[in-house]
C-alpha cells in the first residue's frame, strides 16, 4: 500500500483543529502546526488548540436560528468541535456555551493523541510550496506569514482591518418609505434609498453623537491609526451636523420617482434633506449593505440608532458594523466553494481568514477544507455542500460575492435560496429553511459513495 504524504494544516484555532481531525479520520496523516506557545498572538492566553478568545458562546442552539442550524448541520457531519462543545456545555439559556478551559484542553488532548496527527509547535513563516496545505491562521496571522500570503495572493486581495457596515435583511426594510434609485437616474436603480426630512435627520445625528462606542483593543487601535480612509460614521457625525449630509448621506441627485419628476420645480420641497443608501449584498437581493456606515458603536447602540433611519424602523440586522484588526483574503477573487485556491488546487483555506464570521462558521470551514484536502490526497473528487444548507450557502457566498465590496459574513438566513412559496411569518419561514436544509443535507450524505472518507 502506498504511504500517503502528510497534509499540512497551519493554525490551531477552531478551523485548523476541525480540519486536522477530519483529515486524520479519513485515514490521511496530518501535521498540525500551531505557533503558540513559542509565539503568542495579542489575543491568546494559552497554548491550547481552539482557544476561544472572545465569547464562550457558539450562538443560539435552536435550528430555526442561523447559528443553530449551522451547529445542527455540523452535528450531522460528526464535527469534533461541536461534539466537544456539546460535551462541555454550560447553562446559557438558548445558546451553546462552553467551559472554555475544559473545552480547549479536551480538544488538544483528542487531536494530539490521534495516531495520524503530528502536533508541532512553532511559527510557520511561509506557505509550503509543495504538497497539500490547509491555511487556518485566523485574523491575527503572524507578520511573516502575512507577508508571504501577500506575495501569493497579491496585495490588493488581502485586507488587514475589518471596517464593515451593517447588513440588513431586505424584507425588513419598509419599501413604502425607502425607494429604488441611482444618483441622477444614471444606470439601473441599483440602490435602496432611505430619505430623511430635516427633523428626522437632526434627531438621528443627535442620537449618533451620543451613542456609546465599543473600546478598541490595543492591537486594533494600532491598526486603526492607518485607517483614516474609512472613518466610522459616528466620527463624521462628531465633526458637525452637516458633515454626513455632504459625505455618505448626501441627497444630491436622489429622488423618489413615485413622487413625480425630480426636475420639476414643483417637487423641490419633496427632495430629501439627507439619504442613507443601501447596496445589494447578494445576487438574490435578500441582503442590503448600509453604504458608508462602518462603525465602532456597541451593537445594541447600532440597533437603537440605525432604526431611527426612515425605512429601517423594523430593520433586521444579519451583521452589525465592526472595526477591528482582521486579516482576511478576498475570497470571491481567490477561492472556490470547495475552499481551495483557484490558482492552486492543493492549497485550501478556512476560518476567519476566508471571510466567515463566528465560531460555528470557522468550524464549518475547517470541516469542509479538511474533508476536501483528505479527498484530494485519496484521489477522490472534491465536495461542495448543497446551497440550501447553511454551510453550502455560506461558502457559496464567500466564493461568489462581489470582490469589490467583499466583507466578512456570518451565517444568516438571508444567504439561503428563497423558499418555493413566500412565508410571511418569520419564525415559520426560518423553520422551513431549517427543514429543507437538513433534508437536503441528508440526501447529499446518502449520495456520497465514500462514506468512510467523508465521515458522514
UniProtKB/Swiss-Prot annotation:
Any Pfam family: GIDA
Transmembrane region(s): none
UniProt catalytic activity: uridine(54) in tRNA + (6R)-5,10-methylene-5,6,7,8-tetrahydrofolate + NADH + H(+) = 5-methyluridine(54) in tRNA + (6S)-5,6,7,8-tetrahydrofolate + NAD(+); uridine(54) in tRNA + (6R)-5,10-methylene-5,6,7,8-tetrahydrofolate + NADPH + H(+) = 5-methyluridine(54) in tRNA + (6S)-5,6,7,8-tetrahydrofolate + NADP(+)
Cofactor: FAD
Top EC group: transferase
Recorded superkingdom: Bacteria
Keyword set, alphabetical order: Cytoplasm, FAD, Flavoprotein, Methyltransferase, NAD, NADP, Transferase, tRNA processing
A single GO molecular function term of this UniProt record: tRNA (uracil(54)-C5)-methyltransferase activity, 5,10-methylenetetrahydrofolate-dependent
Principal subcellular localization: cytoplasm
Any GO BP annotation: tRNA wobble uridine modification
Residue runs in coiled coils: none
Positions annotated to bind FAD: 11-16
Cellular localization per UniProt: Cytoplasm
EC number from the UniProt entry: 2.1.1.74
A GO CC annotation given for this chain: cytosol
Function description: Catalyzes the folate-dependent formation of 5-methyl-uridine at position 54 (M-5-U54) in all tRNAs.
HAMAP family listed in its UniProt record: TrmFO (MF_01037)
Similarity comment: Belongs to the MnmG family. TrmFO subfamily.
UniProt name for this protein: Methylenetetrahydrofolate--tRNA-(uracil-5-)-methyltransferase TrmFO
Amino acid at each position: 500500500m502506498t504511504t500517503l504524504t502528510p497534509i499540512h494544516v497551519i493554525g490551531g484555532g477552531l478551523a485548523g483543529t476541525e480540519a486536522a481531525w477530519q483529515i486524520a479520520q479519513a485515514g490521511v496523516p496530518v501535521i498540525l502546526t500551531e505557533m503558540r506557545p513559542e509565539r503568542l498572538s495579542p489575543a491568546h492566553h494559552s497554548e491550547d488548540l481552539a482557544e476561544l478568545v472572545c465569547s464562550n458562546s457558539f450562538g443560539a442552539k435552536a435550528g430555526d436560528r442561523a447559528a443553530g442550524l449551522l451547529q445542527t448541520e455540523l452535528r450531522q457531519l460528526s464535527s469534533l468541535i461541536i461534539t466537544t462543545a456539546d460535551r462541555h456545555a454550560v447553562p446559557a439559556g438558548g445558546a451553546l456555551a462552553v467551559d472554555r478551559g475544559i473545552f480547549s484542553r479536551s480538544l488538544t488532548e483528542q487531536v494530539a493523541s490521534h495516531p495520524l496527527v503530528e502536533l508541532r509547535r512553532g511559527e510557520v513563516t511561509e506557505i509550503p510550496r509543495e504538497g497539500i496545505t490547509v491555511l487556518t491562521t485566523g485574523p491575527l496571522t503572524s507578520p511573516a506569514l502575512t507577508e508571504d500570503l501577500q506575495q501569493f495572493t497579491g496585495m490588493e486581495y488581502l485586507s488587514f482591518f475589518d471596517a464593515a457596515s451593517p447588513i440588513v435583511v431586505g424584507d425588513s426594510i419598509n419599501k413604502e418609505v425607502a425607494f429604488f434609485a441611482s444618483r441622477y437616474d444614471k444606470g439601473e436603480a441599483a440602490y435602496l434609498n432611505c430619505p430623511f426630512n430635516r427633523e428626522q435627520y437632526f434627531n438621528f445625528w443627535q442620537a449618533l453623537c451620543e451613542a456609546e462606542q465599543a473600546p478598541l483593543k490595543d492591537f486594533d487601535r494600532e491598526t486603526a491609526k492607518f485607517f483614516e480612509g474609512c472613518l466610522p460614521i459616528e466620527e463624521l457625525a462628531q465633526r458637525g451636523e452637516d458633515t454626513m449630509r455632504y459625505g455618505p448621506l448626501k441627497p444630491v441627485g436622489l429622488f423618489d420617482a413615485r413622487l413625480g419628476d425630480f426636475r420639476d420645480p414643483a417637487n423641490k420641497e419633496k427632495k430629501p434633506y439627507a439619504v442613507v443608501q443601501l447596496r445589494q449584498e447578494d445576487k438574490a437581493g435578500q441582503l442590503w449593505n448600509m453604504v458608508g456606515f462602518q462603525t465602532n458603536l456597541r451593537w445594541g447602540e447600532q440597533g437603537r440608532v440605525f432604526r431611527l433611519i426612515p425605512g429601517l424602523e423594523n430593520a433586521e440586522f444579519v451583521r452589525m458594523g465592526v472595526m477591528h484588526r482582521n486579516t482576511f483574503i478576498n475570497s470571491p477573487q481567490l477561492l472556490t466553494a470547495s475552499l481551495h485556491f483557484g490558482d492552486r488546487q492543493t492549497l485550501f483555506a478556512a476560518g476567519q481568514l476566508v471571510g466567515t464570521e463566528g465560531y460555528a462558521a470557522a468550524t464549518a470551514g475547517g470541516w469542509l477544507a479538511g474533508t476536501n484536502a483528505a479527498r484530494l490526497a485519496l484521489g477522490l473528487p472534491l465536495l461542495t455542500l448543497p446551497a440550501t444548507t447553511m454551510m453550502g450557502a455560506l461558502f457559496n457566498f464567500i466564493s461568489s460575492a462581489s470582490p469589490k465590496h467583499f466583507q466578512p459574513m456570518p451565517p444568516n438566513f438571508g444567504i439561503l435560496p428563497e423558499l418555493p412559496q413566500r412565508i410571511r411569518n418569520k419564525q415559520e419561514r426560518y423553520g422551513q429553511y431549517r427543514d429543507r436544509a437538513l433534508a437536503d443535507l441528508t440526501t447529499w450524505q446518502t449520495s456520497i459513495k465514500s462514506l468512510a472518507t467523508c465521515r458522514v
